[in-house]
């Protein structure tokens, strides 16, 4: 048995055929290139059609489609709210796939990237054998996939895991509103923006970030500057570590997980901070629970969402650990 898995990211679509053993074949990527609304939906359908053609040529029976998307998903209807894709306010993705690929007649399962990432780690990554695990995805934004007692948590409106809005610092300032307090300081976007602010404000600063036009400073540049001992990069990342540690403490105290897995584009370079994150969490968390949790980097930095989408489809849209 095999399924088609598709992972919609912020800049590209990845698709593949995934079998029951976790084998991945015919991985294909398409760049979004500024597409919006139905243009993105059409590109998804084209990617799926390409995989169906591959499956037919190689005589691989396809039983379902699993799709991983950013934002929030109504898992019952397949409607998607993806704020980074204009026109995807309540986008009927599952129905569009079924309508535009009527000849294939297989079920379509859609879930958010937070949940799909934790599915991938449970199946083939750092969470194998766990029943209580949290996947922290830190990239442009911050989100969490949460599995407790073998069940994925989705919430009343499928919005669980929008952790960028965790309230970690007082008093409230208006700048937190669009992305939340946690993302403001500790997402890739937040790290980049806080570094730009500090460079702009400190006229006496002559570190490595000053060598770049402020508008061109990226999160990657901040980590590179940190490695060179840059004071602004060190300050910005120290604040991010503090926030990551406080968030970890909150998750540990609320959910008592076995593992918290750190992934997304930032963890990458930020995986070196995992011991410091644990030390910060140790100050704040429930004292017994924090000593029982393990903080680890993802084992699937490039494929957790895609494998998770495959796992979702292979399990008929219901991931529940026995």
What does each model-found stretch correspond to?
Residues 16-18, 25-27, 34-37, 100-102, ...:
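Glycine/GP-enriched mid-protein hinge/lid loop-to-helix segment characteristic of carbohydrate kinases
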């Amino acid at each position: 048995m095999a399924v088609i898995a598709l992972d919609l990211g912020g800049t590209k679509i990845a698709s593949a055929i995934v079998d029951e053993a976790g084998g991945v074949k015919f991985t294909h990527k398409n760049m979004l290139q500024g597409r919006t609304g139905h243009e993105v939906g059409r590109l998804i359908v084209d990617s799926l059609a390409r995989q169906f053609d591959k499956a037919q040529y190689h005589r691989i029976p396809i039983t379902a489609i699993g799709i991983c998307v950013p934002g929030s998903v109504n898992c019952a209807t397949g409607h998607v709210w993806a704020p980074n894709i204009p026109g995807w306010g309540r986008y009927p993705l599952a129905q569009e796939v079924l309508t535009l690929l009527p000849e294939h007649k297989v079920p379509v399962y859609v879930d958010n990237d937070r949940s799909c990432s934790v599915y991938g780690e449970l199946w083939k990554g750092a969470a194998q054998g766990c029943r209580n695990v949290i996947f922290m995805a830190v990239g442009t934004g911050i989100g969490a996939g949460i599995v407790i007692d073998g069940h994925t948590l989705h919430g009343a409106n499928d919005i669980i895991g929008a952790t960028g809005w965790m309230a970690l610092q007082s008093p409230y300032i208006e700048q937190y509103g669009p992305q939340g307090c946690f993302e403001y300081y500790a997402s890739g976007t937040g790290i980049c923006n806080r570094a730009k602010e500090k460079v702009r404000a400190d006229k006496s600063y002559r570190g490595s970030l000053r060598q770049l036009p402020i508008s061109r400073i990226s999160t990657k540049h901040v980590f590179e500057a940190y490695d060179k001992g840059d004071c602004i990069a060190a300050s910005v990342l120290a604040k991010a570590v503090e926030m990551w540690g406080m968030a970890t403490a909150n998750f540990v105290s609320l959910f008592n997980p076995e593992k918290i897995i750190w992934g997304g584009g930032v963890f990458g370079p930020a995986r070196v901070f995992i011991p410091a994150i644990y030390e910060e969490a140790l100050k704040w968390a429930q004292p017994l629970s924090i000593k029982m949790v393990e903080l680890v980097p993802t084992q699937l930095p490039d494929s957790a969402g895609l494998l998770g989408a495959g796992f979702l489809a292979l399990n008929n849209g219901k991931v529940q650990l026995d």
